[in-house]
A protein has these predicted regions:
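Short, surface-exposed beta-strand/loop micro-motifs that present aromatic residues
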Residues: 73-75, 142-149
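N-terminal targeting sequences that direct proteins away from the cytosol to non-cytosolic compartments
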Residues: 6, 17-83, 93-120, 124-127, ...
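Sec-dependent signal peptide recognition
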Residues: 2-9
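His/Glu-rich zincin catalytic helix
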Residues: 87
């Protein structure tokens, strides 16, 4: 009888120590990534001493290629550790060669890509036509495009992140930057 009452007392002590008003439910922390704080969408117009001008995001810097003294430039997106490389070509004779070369540049990443999504660019108001390539997967670049006025000007762009490719990790940032690149393309003004 003494043992039974001792067992009952111990069980009551254990049960009362596990509950009450100060009881806390402990759960393991969920696995999560870093929180990305995106800046507000605001743009500034740049007009380098070249045959084009366009709007760029306020959080970026545009640098012309000073080594080759051409109208090639880099749109540096420092906050996101990314750069949009822009190559300007004055069309002399062969527009189709430049279009095919841009397509090959995009499809060179098909080895690592899960898919390449093409989107036609048609903007008759600004006399701008071209193609966008969204490269899905762990490729070196996930976004490329070319635009032209079909007679004098050709601009090719490729977005690179300065990190090892991991599509799932960069996808939110990529989607944010792609909206700004789309705005850049929409606001191109050929001179």
């Amino acid at each position: 009888m003494k043992i039974n009452s001792l067992i009952i007392v111990v069980l009551l002590l254990i049960l009362t120590s596990c509950g009450g008003e100060e009881s806390y439910d402990y759960y393991p922390k969920p696995i999560s990534g870093h929180r990305i704080i995106f800046p507000e969408k605001a743009y500034k117009n740049i007009s380098p001493d070249c045959n084009y001008s366009f709007d760029i995001p306020n959080y970026s810097n545009f640098l012309l290629d000073s080594l080759t003294n051409t109208c090639n430039g880099n749109l540096v997106l420092e906050q996101f550790n990314a750069t949009l490389f822009l190559t300007y070509i004055k069309i002399d004779t062969n527009l189709m060669y430049n279009i095919e070369y841009s397509r090959k540049l995009a499809y060179n990443h098909s080895i690592k890509a899960d898919a390449i999504e093409e989107k036609v660019i048609l903007n008759p108001a600004n006399n701008t036509y071209g193609m966008q390539y969204k490269i899905v997967g762990n490729a070196a670049t996930n976004y490329q495009f070319y635009v032209t006025d079909s007679s004098d000007h050709f601009l090719n762009g490729a977005l690179y992140f300065n990190v090892a490719p991991n599509y799932d990790s960069i996808k939110p940032t990529l989607n944010f930057i792609m909206e700004d690149i789309d705005h850049l393309i929409e606001t191109i003004d050929w001179k």
